[in-house]
């Protein structure tokens, strides 16, 4: 069971007192409060009040309670530090009786962005593969719920930059876009007003395309080497990508997996009589070679 801290206890005690004050019989006419309906977060303002003499003023907000003695002049001054958290507030004034009124504090102008880009790596030319999501906050880190324009600027390693503008929905803006045709670093920047945040996604080569192997025999051994392995956009597959060489001869079927090094894959196989040799990379199959003792 979670223990209640001293600060939490004091807050609960104050709220209980306020609740009790609000239900006390109003045997005398209390001063009237007339706060504005909405206030921008962090903006000082005044509440017109009708009454005379002295009273106790309470301001109950989403994350704190303010209490102070006031003189019932023409208006009550509310400090900017008292209304930094967005949400509903209750103003309570107690002299011979208690009266209350509510008002709403709304987020100020956009001042911070929380920006997420997914994934960190993506194959080139893949539809709807990049997700960008931005959360818009004001300077007090209230989520700005009113619609705000957010520009997502995409700058690929090669090719022209482009952008998309969307409006936030309850503080959130997002897009889904295709990866570009060329491998390399792609920067995505979210911009709202004078605020911007940038993230990077690394585009890598897609599946192999036009995979071909050539063979050089030497006795009962054959050396197999691929042409430079690239995807359909001409991007080289990264070193370490596995290429599979398969041989079928009188001794049976065998497969050797070899990583790409410096753009090509290379291996040696022993051959017994007639043989059929093929190459594949992932789900992509390349050419086949019929080996009859000479190629």
Residue ranges and their predicted role:
Residues 19-28:
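Hydrophobic h-region of N-terminal signal peptides that target proteins for export
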Residues 10-11, 23:
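Short alpha-helical segments used as structural interaction elements across diverse proteins
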Residues 12-18:
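Sec-dependent signal peptide recognition
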Residues 2-9, 27-295:
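The feature marks long extracellular or luminal low-complexity segments
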């Amino acid at each position: 069971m979670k223990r209640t801290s001293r600060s939490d206890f004091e807050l609960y005690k104050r709220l209980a007192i306020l609740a009790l004050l609000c239900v006390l019989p109003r045997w005398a006419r209390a001063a009237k409060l007339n706060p504005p309906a909405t206030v921008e977060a962090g903006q000082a303002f005044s509440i017109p009040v009708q009454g005379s003499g002295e009273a106790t003023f309470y301001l109950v907000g989403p994350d704190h309670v303010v209490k102070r003695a006031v003189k019932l002049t023409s208006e009550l001054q509310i400090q900017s530090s008292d209304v930094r958290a967005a949400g509903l507030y209750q103003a309570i004034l107690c002299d011979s009786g208690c009266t209350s009124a509510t008002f709403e504090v709304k987020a100020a102008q956009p001042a911070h962005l929380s920006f997420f880009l997914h994934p960190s790596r993506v194959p080139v030319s893949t539809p709807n593969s990049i997700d960008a999501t931005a959360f818009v906050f004001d300077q007090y880190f209230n989520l700005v719920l009113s619609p705000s324009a957010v520009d997502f600027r995409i700058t690929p390693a090669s090719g022209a930059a482009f952008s998309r503008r969307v409006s936030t929905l309850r503080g959130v803006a997002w897009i889904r876009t295709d990866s570009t045709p060329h491998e390399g670093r792609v920067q995505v920047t979210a911009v709202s007003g004078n605020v911007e945040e940038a993230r990077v996604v690394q585009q890598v080569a897609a599946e192999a395309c036009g995979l071909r192997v050539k063979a050089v025999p030497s006795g009962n051994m054959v050396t197999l080497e691929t042409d430079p392995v690239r995807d359909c956009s001409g991007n080289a597959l990264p070193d370490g990508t596995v290429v599979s060489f398969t041989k079928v001869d009188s001794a049976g079927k065998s497969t050797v997996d070899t990583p790409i090094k410096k753009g090509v894959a290379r291996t040696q196989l022993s051959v017994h009589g007639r043989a059929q040799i093929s190459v594949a990379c992932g789900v992509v199959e390349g050419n086949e070679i019929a080996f009859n003792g000479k190629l």
